UniProtKB/Swiss-Prot annotation:
Species: Schizosaccharomyces pombe (strain 972 / ATCC 24843) (Fission yeast)
UniProt superkingdom: Eukaryota
GO CC, alphabetical: cytosol; nuclear envelope; nuclear pore; nucleus; transcription export complex 2
Name used for this protein in its record: PCI domain-containing protein C1105.07c
Molecular functions (GO terms): double-stranded DNA binding; RNA binding
Record keywords: Cytoplasm, Nucleus
Length: 442
């Protein structure tokens, strides 16, 4: 196909808003035969190349952004295959910026499919370069964070695309710019997590929920990914119930062949479950190679073995593994109270006698258990009473302390005041808009 024929086909696609034809024209993979053929034509057709700018101006100059888009696409085709990744990224970024301009037109919704495809490639290459580019000594910002040029630039450009989607107020049209909202939101979350700017993810997610986007227009893969990141953000905010619900959906709906993605969901789902007094089955942990990471913690939590839990969490390799995934502090902070609750329950059940009119446990037993479980003899009765008061105040134990006799008196019911942990954890700052968004689109 000559350059003139290619440009005519491309011009017709733009004029007719034919996304299928445009998809066939805009090829980004240098290994594709059509890409190679166009690249060869650009190289060989010197006469056509000299007239190229004039032809592009004639065919595409009437619509803002399209002349620049076609020009940068030809630059990409001509140079991408022979350029290093850094140069290829620059070419792709120029192309993406102009594509976003075209997409921002009031009637740009027909470009949704190609915008999603180019966005994915752009973000993928940005992340690859971020990983492969060595960190320089002076590449830190004023706050001490690593400056990530490729990811930072990508996040700004993809955010521009996202804002274009949000600003589209047209209702009940097909296609709609909002057809791309979940894909673009997920890419932004991926970039923001790499940048450790999780609060920006929360802003993106809130905008998606308030946008009135139709979940039925999203693919299951997009929805699974969106709820995975939503669960991660809720876990970051210590909203454990909400995090568990989204991560459970993400894990269950993710296809079995997507092993890595299911494993990621299970890592954070398991973290939520431990805080809620639950745990996955051994078989599930084994299947996703998480036994070494979580089984020692689960065993210690169930038995109230505080020393073993701390040693397991502080194990050098395990600690690094948890820190890398951003759950170390969450486990350290939220599991401590569960350990004390389970330890005191274990002591009560071991010492309880049916002859007791009111269930209770002596503080001396609790003190002995505290010293043994922590391997710390510095604990005294005041410490034990403070722990009991904290457990009662947070609802983990229903009862009261008799200070004079150092006795923990428990509620007279089948659970003896030790209610199911999940029912005690508060649903912090329940977001009704979020709940209604997923319920309305169920």
């Amino acid at each position: 196909m000559s350059l003139n024929d290619f440009l005519q086909t491309l011009s017709n696609a733009v004029g007719e808003k034919n996304s299928n034809t445009l998809e066939k024209c805009i090829i980004l993979d240098p290994s594709e035969p059509s890409f190679q053929q166009l690249s060869k034509t650009l190289f060989l057709d010197r006469k056509g190349k000299n007239k190229l700018n004039g032809t592009i101006q004639k065919e595409f100059g009437r619509i803002r952004g399209w002349k620049e888009l076609v020009t940068t696409y030809f630059e990409y085709v001509e140079n991408a295959a022979s350029s290093p990744d850094q140069r290829k990224w620059e070419l792709l970024q120029n192309l993406y910026s102009n594509l976003t301009t075209c997409f921002s037109h009031i009637d740009g919704a027909w470009l949704c499919t190609i915008v999603k495809r180019v966005s994915k490639l752009y973000v993928k290459l940005s992340l690859q370069l971020d990983t492969s580019t060595p960190t320089l000594e002076d590449s830190f910002d004023g706050n001490g964070f690593i400056q990530r040029k490729y990811v930072s630039d990508a996040s700004r450009n993809v955010l521009r695309t996202f804002n274009s989607i949000l600003s589209d107020r047209q209702q009940n049209i097909n296609p709609s710019k909002k057809d791309a909202i979940f894909c673009i939101a997920n890419l932004l979350c991926l970039l923001y997590f790499r940048l450790k700017q999780i609060r920006l993810c929360q802003t993106i997610q809130a905008n998606v929920i308030s946008s009135g986007a139709d979940i039925s227009r999203a693919t299951m893969a997009e929805l699974v990914t969106f709820r995975y990141y939503l669960g991660r953000c809720h876990l970051y905010q210590r909203k454990i119930h909400q995090a568990k619900d989204h991560l459970l959906f993400s894990f269950l709906q993710c296809p079995d062949e997507c092993y890595h993605q299911k494993r990621l969901s299970l890592i954070y789902l398991t973290t939520c479950l431990l805080i809620l007094g639950k745990s996955p089955t051994k078989g599930l942990l084994e299947k996703y190679k998480l036994t070494a990471a979580f089984e020692p913690l689960i065993k210690a939590l169930k038995s109230g073995d505080i020393k073993s839990f701390r040693l397991s969490l502080e194990d050098n390799s395990r600690r690094k593994w948890f820190i890398k995934r951003g759950i170390y502090l969450t486990l350290l902070d939220r599991c401590e109270i569960i350990l004390w609750r389970n330890l005191f329950r274990k002591v009560f059940l071991f010492t309880f006698e049916q002859s007791q009119k009111t269930p209770h446990v002596s503080g001396s037993y609790l003190l002995t258990a505290a010293r043994l479980s922590t391997n710390d003899n510095s604990y005294d009765m005041d410490d034990v009473e403070c722990i009991c008061v904290s457990l009662i105040d947070q609802g983990y134990i229903k009862g009261y302390i008799i200070h004079a006799s150092s006795t923990l008196v428990l509620k007279k019911d089948p659970s003896f005041g030790f209610s199911v942990i999940e029912s005690l954890m508060p649903i912090a700052r329940n977001d009704h808009a979020e709940k209604e968004f997923f319920h309305a689109n169920a």
